[in-house]
Amino acid sequence: MTAFQQLPSSVLQTGAIFLSIIIEALPFVLIGSIVSGLIEVYITPDKVYHFLPRNRWGRIFFGTFVGILFPSCECGIVPIINRFLEKNVPSYTAVPFLVTAPVINPIVLFATYSAFGNSFHIALLRALGSIVVAVILGIFLGFFWQEPIQKENRLACHEHDFSHLSPVKKVFQVFVQAIDEFFDTGRYLVFGCIFASVIQVYVPTRILTSISATPLFAILLLMLLAFLLSLCSEADAFIGASLLSSFGLAPVMAFLVIGPMLDIKNILMMKNYLKARFISHFITIVTLVVLVYSLLIGVIL
């Protein structure tokens, strides 16, 4: 205890903020990991394909909103999308699912609601932002994109077929998948919590004030931060909430909306399965739509 008392107060404050953020976030990461394990073991692309509407618009909106029923963390969403495409689920259904599934599911929405002090409107704004991006991407792919988005000689997807397992073994595999997901996500969460706590303690308030005074720059900065941190969608709301007082609502909303869509690990996984031309269009559309959406929030709210 004496050793801790000898540490500078700034270090102790950083540690306290770090612990407060991570303790709030971990239960949601754990729940999300278990749900992800359930989906991995029990939900197959064939089952989803049977429920697809017949018309193009219906399929765009199906892909946009089906994530409410089948929540999936963005950490493993790209291989799932690859399997959908291989089962002839159209790209204008699969890609909107990629964008919204990590955001509009009940776990992430409740995590966002809790992180911002039981704020329903921030959770709603986040969901609305991801829906807008998903619909625009779906329209682009459904009506303007004329080629497959998958690579012809793509790397083999690391998948497992659990359909032949007994019920007991399936339950066991759910926990195996959940544990793997939890620890994979946890390392990104720890880094993000450290970063957020260091910013609050060591970055001078005048610097943060000058950044937030220029909305466009603040939005772009937090979009870049979301890309670099590569946080799990069950946990990023707690990091975003810790940045709200420093940057304001519009930049934090950009952070929350773009994070599950564009980050380092997702882009690297996309390169394994999807064409570079599509990825460049995807990055451009997502970035522009999130930027405009966040600027509008700054103007209206």
Please provide the spans of the model-predicted regions.
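Selected transmembrane alpha-helices and immediately adjacent juxtamembrane segments
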Residues: 2-34, 46, 50, 124-223, ...
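Short helix-loop boundary/capping segments at the starts of domains
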Residues: 24, 28-31, 40, 44, ...
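Interfacial helix-start motif at the membrane-water boundary
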Residues: 24-25, 63-69, 228
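Short glycine-rich loop/turn motifs that provide flexible caps or phosphate-binding loops at active sites
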Residues: 31, 62, 66, 75, ...
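Membrane-embedded helical hairpins/re-entrant loop segments and their flanking transmembrane helices
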Residues: 36-66, 208-213, 239-240
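Structural signal for the C-terminal ends of transmembrane alpha-helices
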Residues: 38-43, 202, 264-265
